[in-house]
Amino acid sequence: RPVNVMGATKQIAERIILHLQEEYPNTSFGAVRFGNVLGSSGSVIPLFKRQLENGEPLTLTDQDVTRYFMTIPEAVQLILKASILDSFPGQVAMLDMGEPIKILDLARNLLRLSGRQFRMGENVIVTGLRPGEKMHEELAAPDETVHATEERRVFLVETPEEFSEIPYGLRVSLGNADGLALLDFLVAEFGAAENQPSALKELGATLTMSGSKMEQEA
């Protein structure tokens, strides 16, 4: 369940891929869902390592925040193993990443490995959750069904959503070279969500107002 624009665009990408399988059945299309890839650009461990090297406190958004992690080899294996599954075309695959990891525990272990003592409020500080950031990640939505495959750690996610309207809306926006309309379209689907973060609501409202202003000026 996306709560920010990045999550929304990822879900839209999944829908496009699955729609392509319906439109071009002679070609195999499928998508994979990643967890947080350790060591990748923007991930928490490179951030913590940089802060340690600079003598800075480790920053985390909340003491209770958790995340699922996978290594780069696991990410590669997920793509390769999913791609050879007979049941993969037209599906979304994800990896069994075990239990989510508490970021506070990750910070504590990195400090210990670097020979430093853990001192909350001194070398570890809490900055607060950012707009659109989740406390805990969900690998699958409540209305999705997860199925096992012949690959022990690879699962397929079945979603009840219909995909036909998404590609059509994207085609209209892209065909008109209208970036505002495209973003507005992406955000609008989540406008009715009760727990939608204010940042996403504000972006949707801003895009709508900007689009209306452009129409008036034209």
Where are these regions (language model features)?
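Active-site His/Glu-centered metal-binding helix of metallohydrolases
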Residues: I12
